Amino acid sequence: MKIVEVKHPLVKHKLGLMREGDISTKRFRELATEVASLLTYEATSDFETEKVTIEGWNGPVQVDQIKGKKVTVVPILRAGLGMMDGVLEHIPSARISVVGIYRDEETLEPVPYFNKLATNIEERIAMVVDPMLAIGGSMIATIDLLKEKGCNQIKVLVLVAAPEGIAALEKAHPDVELYTAAIDEKLNDKGYIVPGLGDAGDKIFGTK
């Protein structure tokens, strides 16, 4: 599995700000969008381009444009919505596919409850966004669903990943690509990433 930990100074700086324990909902939400935007820049670096002739200000001119890539952004509800706009800043024409999965707090197993996928998803590159890759169950279940529907070009964008989640994802789906702002130390006994960000969904939505 291709694993990219994006170590750009802006990414490290913004993620560091997100780790503050008393960060406001507004600030956390803004930073989640900004980091997602920077991850998108990295995740699309392998998109092919082609020469296209357009009418410029002084006549025809050849320009580079992305070659035939249809993209769908796949936020995992609910926390993934906090990263969606960061992707759409760069790919505003992307279709949105929504997958609802929550983690059972006792068993830590993923529980699917909703999905609405873009049309012709088998022809699209899926960019799955979720702030945390902890145990990996929700991400694996989402990718299972996408592959069942014929989507086999999948990139995963997360703010923070735990080694345990990376290992689980690689075992289940070695063909996907993972882009993360940080690979943290470990999971604690409650399945939270340490040092992590805390509950990203609560911080994005202002709930507890």
Swiss-Prot record:
Pfam families: UPRTase. GO terms for molecular function: GTP binding; magnesium ion binding; uracil phosphoribosyltransferase activity. Its cofactor is Mg(2+). It comes from the Bacteria. Its EC number is 2.4.2.9. It catalyses: UMP + diphosphate = 5-phospho-alpha-D-ribose 1-diphosphate + uracil. InterPro entries: PRibTrfase_dom (IPR000836), PRTase-like (IPR029057), Upp_B (IPR034332), UPRTase/APRTase (IPR050054), Ura_phspho_trans (IPR005765). Transmembrane segments: none annotated. Keywords: Allosteric enzyme, Glycosyltransferase, GTP-binding, Magnesium, Nucleotide-binding, Transferase. One of its GO terms (cellular component) is cytoplasm. Allosterically activated by GTP. Binds 1 Mg(2+) ion per subunit. The magnesium is bound as Mg-PRPP. Disulfide bonds: none annotated. Pathway: Pyrimidine metabolism; UMP biosynthesis via salvage pathway; UMP from uracil: step 1/1. One of its GO terms (biological process) is uracil salvage. Uracil binds at I193, G198, D199, A200. 5-phospho-alpha-D-ribose 1-diphosphate binds at R78, R103, D130, P131, M132, L133, A134, I135, G136, G137, S138, D199. Belongs to the UPRTase family. Catalyzes the conversion of uracil and 5-phospho-alpha-D-ribose 1-diphosphate (PRPP) to UMP and diphosphate. This is Uracil phosphoribosyltransferase. The gene is upp.
